[in-house]
């Protein structure tokens, strides 16, 4: 059978289900596929298929994730669902599953629980821009007042983590009853998908953002000058444009005198391309791996930041022993290791943490020895002697 061609006639959005264990994330995911399948917009996937997600490795960390795709009238969605709580933590921090928005699943029978809170905090820290709430298992609650109380509690919780709690849609659903084909609950899944369509904004495409390419290698070509190679992370670059070299040393501007890919000249390089940029008046010594080439003024180098970090367990190849504030690892940022120091660890409630154990999910403050182009929402790894011992995301730039 010939492979189906991916039709790109609708905008594409990445979403996922988050929330407390046993509140019905996977059942709801299965319900979305079963309801949309009746309109020919999805392939039915049952609970067992989604729950038995294969292991994936992202930066050496093992994560179980199920990927489901479906479409609504206006959009194409890629949806991720994770079987275990630890998988969510790792997934969101490593950015293995980049989410443009998420469906927060909360059972009406329980209300918000510990992991409901932790997932909302994580979503905030890693920069998930928008949430929609699916209040699940509503078929099991007869008392309308209880449902109202749970909704109020969820709204207050969302607001306490700086999400617009009063405006986020909360849709009463029953994943199980929708799968069983009960019409009123199938209609609720449609209502949920309408809320997702309207409340989760379409992501800005990488190509429309300001140009950035991290330098992987530098060559000098006799008679032509210096070429920096790498993958264009976002935006585009044309021959003749001015760019800025940022990070490690003082920023400086130069002009791109050529863009080449596979030894052929291009008019312009686009997001996703691996290419070489020929730079005017730059010596090979002026530029090194770890610097970035950017649209002038679009990014400034920083040394101090806050990050949300997952510390690998011993079984994942991480450390066997705890570490403390003052620890000096390498931070692997884009294409290079930069030495830095972790000056403080903070718990969820804002209190200081003395000791961090393998397997922890923690907020840290880091300081690098030289300024690098770091940005909010950017992923990094923490390494020690060349092996990864943690994965993190920049939650805030300090200086």
From Swiss-Prot:
Residues 136-139 are annotated as: G4. GTP binds at residues 19-26, 81-85, 136-139. Keywords: Cytoplasm, Elongation factor, GTP-binding, Hydrolase, Magnesium, Metal-binding, Nucleotide-binding, Protein biosynthesis. Pfam families: GTP_EFTU (PF00009), GTP_EFTU_D2 (PF03144), GTP_EFTU_D3 (PF03143). Its EC number is 3.6.5.3. Its main location: cytoplasm. Residues 174-176 are annotated as: G5. It catalyses: GTP + H2O = GDP + phosphate + H(+). Residues 19-26 are annotated as: G1. InterPro entries: EF-Tu_GTP-bd (IPR041709), EF-Tu_GTPase (IPR050055), EFTu-like_2 (IPR004161), EFTU_2 (IPR033720), G_TR_CS (IPR031157), P-loop_NTPase (IPR027417), Small_GTP-bd (IPR005225), T_Tr_GTP-bd_dom (IPR000795). Residues 81-84 are annotated as: G3. It is an enzyme of class 3 (hydrolase). PANTHER family: ELONGATION FACTOR TU, MITOCHONDRIAL (PTHR43721:SF22), ELONGATION FACTOR TU-RELATED (PTHR43721). Belongs to the TRAFAC class translation factor GTPase superfamily. Classic translation factor GTPase family. EF-Tu/EF-1A subfamily. Monomer. This is Elongation factor Tu. It comes from Prochlorococcus marinus (strain MIT 9303).
